[in-house]
Amino acid sequence: MGTSPFVLPFAALEVGQHLYWQIGKLRIHGQVFMTSWILIGALLTLVVVGTKKMERDPKGVQNLLEFLWDYIRDLARTQIGEKVYRDWMPFIGTLFLFIFVSNWGGALIPWKLIELPSGELGAPTADINTTVALALLVSLSYFYAGLSNKGLRYFEYYVHPTPIMLPFKIVEDFTKPLSLSFRLFGNILADELVVAVLVFLVPLVLPVPVMFLGLFTSAIQALIFATLAAYYIGEAVEEHH
């Protein structure tokens, strides 16, 4: 009985294989490290180019950056509040741009052309380590926001409006980073896998509209993550009466 011609392409689809670098006792995930810094470098280059010659009438990259600045400012002001939103704009903006560029970079850049000894390159946000790290950073940020603005009064939140809420709000502190990390990871990984499988099955036809749909959902996921991060920070600094 002969082997089906469809078996080999599916066998070549690598899921869960990683390239690791060992530096002393530290084990670094090479794929995420490389793609993250490539995309961060591209983002920094865009910012430098857009702000090199600032004009009163913005054009090109400067116009794009000013649009993003206004968008992030409105997002932070709406979710965090007028009082302290300016302090958190850089953080929310960095989260949004990094996730957005990572998601789109995974979809648009032909990473598979770069061969690795093990695994393959892809969106940093398609790796659970990246999304968990971002989610934990958000958790630390809203704890810091609450304590820095209210001091020990922040813990009144856990018994507001009634002490019965204490166990539920403690559980909520664990579910927030879990939902943030797994939502982002699951959506981006699923998008990459669907496109990869369709490329094997129906190359050059069906994957194209799916890729455009993936770009849309990738942008939405970046917006959801940044919006929830800002909302959690706003919730932490909100005064309860």
UniProtKB/Swiss-Prot annotation:
One example GO MF annotation: proton-transporting ATP synthase activity, rotational mechanism
CDD domains assigned: ATP-synt_Fo_a_6
Membrane topology type: Multi-pass membrane protein
Principal cellular location given in the protein's record: membrane
Any GO CC annotation of this UniProt entry: proton-transporting ATP synthase complex
Record's keyword annotation contains Membrane: yes
Keywords: ATP synthesis, CF(0), Hydrogen ion transport, Ion transport, Membrane, Thylakoid, Transmembrane, Transmembrane helix, Transport
The protein's assembly and partners: F-type ATPases have 2 components, CF(1) - the catalytic core - and CF(0) - the membrane proton channel. CF(1) has five subunits: alpha(3), beta(3), gamma(1), delta(1), epsilon(1). CF(0) has four main subunits: a, b, b' and c.
Known role: Key component of the proton channel; it plays a direct role in the translocation of protons across the membrane.
Family label: Belongs to the ATPase A chain family.
Name of the protein: ATP synthase subunit a
Origin species: Prochlorococcus marinus (strain SARG / CCMP1375 / SS120)
Gene: atpB
